[in-house]
Amino acid sequence: MQPTPFSSLSSADGCWTGLRLAQGLFIPDVAVPDDALSCVVVQGGTVRWVGPVAAVPPAFAALPRHAGGGALATPGLVDCHTHLVYGGHRANEFAMRLAGASYEEVARAGGGIVSSVKATRAASEDELFAQALPRLQALLDEGVCAIEIKSGYGLALEHERKQLRAARRLGEACGVTVRTTFLGAHALPPEYAGRSQDYIDLVCREMLPALAEEGLVDAVDVFCERIAFSLAETEQVFQAAQALGLPVKLHAEQLSDMDGARLAARYGALSCDHIEHLSAEGIAAMKAAGTVAVLLPGAYYTLRDTHLPPIQALREAGVPMAVSTDHNPGTSPALSLRLMANMACTLFRLTVPEALAGITTHAARALGLQDTHGLIAAGRPADFVLWPFAEAAELAYWFGHQPPQAIVRQGRVVQR
């Protein structure tokens, strides 16, 4: 049977032959000799078998064949922390930071998150969808097959709702797994200046229950920091999420050690994100809770931060480390997850295997998707990417425009 060109495929069903798989990194419990090419068998949009080409079971002999030509195969990439839906942009703040303004100084001058709140409130749901679509498409074109999208630029029920609705629509329109996170406790809206407890009460008693009832919330996040919300206020939001059966995550220890990681771990948080100022006690708590450390080198780079996350301590403790774009209009206008992998290696000194696990396996865990995403394995949905690279290290080594050869997402070949 002659192989079918990728450009003429719609369904991914068949035997994807002649692939090179990075052993020990992407494919669990499959032994493939280093010099052997592999095969991924897809039926009904699900991976049915993975192994050496020479050992494909006879039961799959009649399936169409798709020749990989020695391409490197990886799981679909997972971007586990983004603020993709928002109005406007904040390019003016770039100049402020270049002139020496700190993150906190920009925020106190009326910029930062509150600036995006004004633009987001002024936009309709359709406008937010239209603005976010090309951002999402840029990430998908690079092989992202699952993504988190947070709210947090509405800071009022109607505006948080339209952000989350736009996020759901993006997933449906693009055929990609989108996990929505309610980040109502992102910043104090201007109309609640000096009344943070009143706003937290609104978040916990009205906004979160209403949005959860509408099926718009997969997880709940808080920005716990001196310029945002206190530890006590964060816990109130976590308690409200717990009462609704929703998992939590946290913007933790980005600018200072607020002891947020230990609090998040007590609530079994999926992840703690940023964590530049994470303490030894926080690391121990995260390890015990199985909480993922999400590294955001794009924000670190944009803010010209110099306080590195405690990578070696996380490594020694065995805390899984994910890497994400943190795409947002102010501190990380990044639209390349592979560039973030490169930055995680270059700036944070992750090893290449750590960085690649960080944008696949561990990123999936940070979203609660560890049973369906982040690995190529029998029984999982067919989400994988073929690359024109000789070895896996090239995924983090190259940066710039290096498009995949083929993308399989939700069991279908993506035509670009």
Curated annotation (Swiss-Prot):
InterPro entries named among the record's database cross-references: Amidohydro-rel, HutI, Metal-dep_hydrolase_composite, Metal_Hydrolase
Coarse class of the protein's main subcellular location: cytoplasm
Catalytic activity: 4-imidazolone-5-propanoate + H2O = N-formimidoyl-L-glutamate
Binding-site residues for 4-imidazolone-5-propanoate, renumbered to this chain: 90, 153, 186, 254, 331
Coiled-coil intervals, chain numbering: none
EC code: 3.5.2.7
Enzyme class per UniProt: hydrolase
Residues annotated for N-formimidoyl-L-glutamate binding in this entry: 153, 328, 330
Pfam families per the UniProt record, alphabetical: Amidohydro_1
GO biological process: L-histidine catabolic process to glutamate and formamide; L-histidine catabolic process to glutamate and formate
Cofactor binding note of this UniProt entry: Binds 1 zinc or iron ion per subunit.
Keyword line: Cytoplasm, Histidine metabolism, Hydrolase, Iron, Metal-binding, Zinc
Protein name (record): Imidazolonepropionase
Organism: Paracidovorax citrulli (strain AAC00-1)
